[in-house]
Amino acid sequence: MILNVLFILVGIVLVLWGADRLTDGAVAVAEKLKMPQIVIGLTIVAMGTSMPEFCVSLVSALKGTTDLAVGNIVGSNIFNTLLIVGVSAWVAPMTILKSTVRKDIPFALFASVILLIMCLDGNISRLDAGILFVLFLVFMYVTLKGAKTKEDDTTAKTEPIEDKKKPMAAWLSIVWIIVGLACLIGGSNLFVEGATKVAEHIGVSEAVIGLTIVAGGTSLPELATSVVSARKGNSGIAIGNVLGSNVFNILAILGVTGVITPMHLQGITMLDLSMMVVSTLLVWLFSFTKYKIARWEGIVLTIVFIGYMVVLCY
């Protein structure tokens, strides 16, 4: 039991550190290839923050623990919308960008509803996964197109600012990519192995472990970043990133994972999937009050999360 808990702890550290190193290396390569900053931010950096969820879910599915794979995604999305947004609003009221209310939250809600409908038969087939991934490509196209337009408008009105940051050496960026991938793969295997054994030892389902321990572990960076952003008054960007992560989790991660290996669900219930939908809907409703999420609304989100955890574990 102690060894398996150690596997979980070491695994999550390797996964998180590996994702960070992989992202640094990939960004450095992209900059050397003269990719626009907006494209780097919306693709490499955004995907890098979701690499822990992706690797853990993919490894879980390949090992046959599909409840752990799907539970990780569903649990991460619930964790993001209820706990991260809730705690961040508790720290400081969150100002929501209009684009987030009009585009990001509705699309996250749409993705959640689509996943719920697909899971009604207890399976995520290759066809289901293919549809999810096509929707992800549509989302990325619309997002990049909109962001590029905004960037063109901004650069037309402002003077270029010289970037004084020293670029990473080419050899070092390649090293970080290789090291990051190795840590992600090794850490994911350790994490999944430890989580599976702990579930067997304490007599709970893999789905519960995925919805709680695994989801919480892979979402810790978003929690820390969002709370710090809220304290610094940058909550609008933080909540947009959290919701963007939710869309990526469902459409890209489950899309790719499901195409590689179809997933049969046993422990993931309609309660879990419905909570994912309801949590997104709550954030959307709260955001209409002057485009802010007040402290009391953050407390409500946090209480709902705690209540869900209690029901899930007992």
Write out the residue ranges for each language-model feature.
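Hydrophobic alpha-helical segments, chiefly the membrane-spanning helices
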Residues: M1-Y314
